[in-house]
């Protein structure tokens, strides 16, 4: 587990598939989580209790100690804190292009800090013209020289504060789950909460 600040946790493959493994959740000390059924869209919903909160790609709350979680395997997991609120976002390229980050910023209000977890980095995030056209200011190259997108840069451009980015590529690192590398359904968790 990577815990860069109070109220923020990013799991690794060693922690297990957090989407399915409730015992692994308990090892984190946060057994009850508020979650959403992720759809690669822009919706961010408010949560006041644990459980499923429908189709969305982000959650926000002011409830102290309520763990909000999204699950990723190459997409960005983003945690925003500010003014007694927290938002957790599943930010894939479709969601970033659709405005999920801006919607989360709106839900938090006065954003004080942002953490971006392990995700597919430009070294491995090869994209075609339909994706690159949406991220013109954030293009890069893969290790093999093909066009890629720096999604963390695209997210950072939509934030009111400079994010702390965990600079670990899910596809390159065997200690992370990666849909592009493995094609499995295993997922990392991004968890955020308002500390007590």
Predicted regions and their residues:
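Active-site microenvironment for binding and transforming phosphate-containing groups
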Residues: 1-196
């Amino acid at each position: 587990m990577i815990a860069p600040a109070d109220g923020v946790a990013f799991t690794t493959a060693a922690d297990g598939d957090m989407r399915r493994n409730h015992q692994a959740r308990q090892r984190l000390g946060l057994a009850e989580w508020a979650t959403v059924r992720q759809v690669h869209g822009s919706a961010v919903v408010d949560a006041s209790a644990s459980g499923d909160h429908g189709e969305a790609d982000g959650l926000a709350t002011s409830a102290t100690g309520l763990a909000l979680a999204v699950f990723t395997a190459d997409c960005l997991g983003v945690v925003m804190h500010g003014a007694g609120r927290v938002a957790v976002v599943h930010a894939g390229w479709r969601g970033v292009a659709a405005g999920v980050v801006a919607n989360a910023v709106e839900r938090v209000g006065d954003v004080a800090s942002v953490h971006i977890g392990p995700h597919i980095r430009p070294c491995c995030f090869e994209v075609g013209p339909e994706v690159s056209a949406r991220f013109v200011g954030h293009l890069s190259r893969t290790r093999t020289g093909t066009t890629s997108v720096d999604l963390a840069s695209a997210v950072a451009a939509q934030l009111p504060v400079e994010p702390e980015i965990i600079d670990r590529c899910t596809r390159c690192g065997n200690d992370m789950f990666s849909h592009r590398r493995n094609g499995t359904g295993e997922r990392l968790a991004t968890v955020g909460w308002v500390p007590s």
